[in-house]
């Protein structure tokens, strides 16, 4: 999110109901001892506004519900969506809403237990391996007729 803000993206919507905890410190830039137990969306919003005060930011401290996702995607003309949801049902709902509304999506998969950032790759979901979350996403998408 931070590089996109630095690159000059003018509008960002962030929806997250999670708070920062110790396990986030090794992999999330906003996770510090000084930010523990604070809403991730609030800390990220402060950082983004500090990088780009002109940024139009919609930061919502809530877990996104499956039922709301389609409406949010349909009612907003996003150039692309970055999915960092780690719960399967809302992740699938977001992916399918983006596909249905022809909105580009970049979806992160499992990072838990990973320690070598040089092994991060970008691939179509059909080309992923050694990731339980990606496997579950693939399987669920296949049951919906999405390849």
What is each model feature region?
Residues 1-147:
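Adenine nucleotide-associated cytosolic modules
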């Amino acid at each position: 999110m931070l590089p996109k803000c630095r690159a000059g993206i003018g509008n960002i919507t962030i929806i997250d109901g999670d708070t920062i905890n110790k396990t986030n410190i090794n992999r999330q830039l906003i996770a510090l001892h000084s930010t523990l137990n604070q809403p991730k969306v609030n800390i990220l919003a402060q950082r983004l506004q500090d990088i780009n005060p002109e940024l139009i930011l919609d930061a919502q401290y809530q877990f996104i519900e499956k039922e709301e996702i389609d409406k949010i995607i349909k009612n907003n003309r996003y150039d692309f969506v970055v999915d960092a949801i780690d719960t399967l049902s809302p992740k699938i709902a977001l992916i399918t809403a983006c596909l249905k509304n022809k909105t580009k999506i970049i979806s992160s998969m499992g990072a838990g237990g990973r320690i070598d950032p040089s092994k991060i790759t970008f691939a179509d979901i059909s080309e992923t391996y050694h990731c339980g979350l990606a496997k579950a996403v693939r399987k669920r998408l296949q049951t919906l007729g999405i390849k």
